[in-house]
Amino acid sequence: MSELISVAGLVATTPRHLVTQDGLPITSFRLASSQRRFDRSQNKWIDGETNWYTVTGFRQLAINASTSVSKGDRILVTGKLRVRDWDNGERAGTSVEIEAESIGHDLSWGSAVFTRTVLVRETETSDTDSAAIDEAVDNLSKEFLQEAELVGNKKK
C-alpha cells in the first residue's frame, strides 16, 4: 500500500539523522497521533487512542528536518503510507510508516520562523537509489521496532 496521507502529531523520539555510504541523507523519528475531543460533562479534553508512525525523510527534507524538528514538537507530516507486517521469531506485529514528502510545525500549538535553504538540484532517482532508500527504511524500521517499547508502542 502506498497512499498519500497527512497526519498531525507529536514527535515522540529524538530524530535520527544519517548519511548513507552513497551520500543519501536520511532523518527518521516516531510520531504519536491522538484524536482529542472535548467532554462537556467533565469540562475537559479527552485523548483518544494513539496511533504510532515511523516517519522517514530523504535528501533535502532529511537535512532540514534534522535541524528543525525536535522531540516533543507538534508537527504535520504528509507522505506515502506503508503498512508492513513483521515477525522476528519472538514477536510479530505491524509497522506503520510514512515516507515524508513534507514536514512542518503545527502552528495551532505555537509559532515558527521560516528560513529558506538553498536547494541542491536533484538528479532523477535511479533504481540503485530506490534500492538504497528501501534498504535504509527497512534498517531504520527494525531499529525503531526494537525501541518501540520505550515510547509506549508495546506489541503483544
PLM feature spans:
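Conserved positions in beta-strands of structured domains
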Residues: 11-12, 16-18, 58, 82, ...
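A beta-strand/beta-hairpin structural motif
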Residues: 42-67
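OB-fold/S1-family single-stranded nucleic acid-binding modules
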Residues: 88-111
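Acidic, gly/ser/pro-rich intrinsically disordered tails
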Residues: 1, 19-22, 107-156
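Short, acidic/hydrophobic/Gly-rich beta-strand patch recurrent on exposed beta strands
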Residues: 28-32, 54-56, 98-99
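Beta-rich strand-turn-strand
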Residues: 58-92
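OB-fold and OB-like beta-barrel modules that bind single-stranded nucleic acids
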Residues: 5-12, 31, 71-82, 100
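Core FKBP-type peptidyl-prolyl cis-trans isomerase
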Residues: 5-47, 90-94
